[in-house]
């Protein structure tokens, strides 16, 4: 038997399924695909924007490639923030980190200690950065 101290279900809990059906039957307005309002722009600008979108997408080829500490410093490119790299935590430093994906970093990068409200800085990969 039920305990007398248990609270009975509320009206909203009893009508949960009906509320869901009513919500989806009302066909709610969802966010548009483009969050920017439509603008008239030249075909050059729109094609350049499409090129930028395709080149700034995350690199999916290196996901989970940091096995046993080797080649564990690959990141996914889109979410790398280069300001305030203070490394205040030692989670995953020096080891592979086991696929720890914090803040867009995959493989063995681990937590780099980037503030959540730091501005997003895009960095173009050049040969001098690799050396």
From Swiss-Prot:
Localisation: Nucleus; Cytoplasm, Perinuclear region
Post-translational modification: Phosphorylated with a circadian rhythmicity, probably by the double-time protein (dbt). Phosphorylation could be implicated in the stability of per monomer and in the formation of heterodimer per-tim.
Residue ranges crossing the lipid bilayer per the database entry: none
Taxonomic source organism: Zaprionus tuberculatus (Vinegar fly)
Compositional bias per record (Gly residues), positions renumbered to this chain: 94-109
Biased composition (Low complexity): 71-93
Protein name: Period circadian protein
Function, in words: Essential for biological clock functions. Determines the period length of circadian and ultradian rhythms; an increase in PER dosage leads to shortened circadian rhythms and a decrease leads to lengthened circadian rhythms. Essential for the circadian rhythmicity of locomotor activity, eclosion behavior, and for the rhythmic component of the male courtship song that originates in the thoracic nervous system. The biological cycle depends on the rhythmic formation and nuclear localization of the TIM-PER complex. Light induces the degradation of TIM, which promotes elimination of PER.
GO BP, sorted A to Z: rhythmic process
Record region (Disordered): 29-109
GO CC annotations, alphabetized: nucleus; perinuclear region of cytoplasm
UniProt KW keywords: Biological rhythms, Cytoplasm, Nucleus, Phosphoprotein, Repeat
Subunit details: Forms a heterodimer with timeless (TIM); the complex then translocates into the nucleus.
Primary location: nucleus
């Amino acid at each position: 038997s039920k305990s007398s101290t248990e609270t009975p279900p509320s009206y909203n809990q009893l009508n949960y399924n009906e509320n869901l059906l009513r919500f989806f039957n009302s066909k709610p307005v969802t966010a548009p695909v483009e969050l920017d309002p439509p603008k008239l722009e030249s075909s050059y600008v729109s094609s350049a924007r499409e090129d930028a979108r395709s080149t700034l997408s995350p690199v999916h080829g290196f996901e989970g490639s940091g096995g046993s500490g080797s080649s564990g410093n690959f990141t996914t490119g889109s979410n790398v923030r280069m300001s305030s790299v203070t490394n205040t935590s030692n989670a995953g430093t020096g080891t592979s980190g086991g696929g720890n994906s914090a803040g867009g970093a995959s493989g063995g990068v681990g937590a780099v200690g980037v503030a959540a409200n730091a501005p997003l800085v895009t960095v173009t990969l050049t040969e001098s950065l690799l050396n």
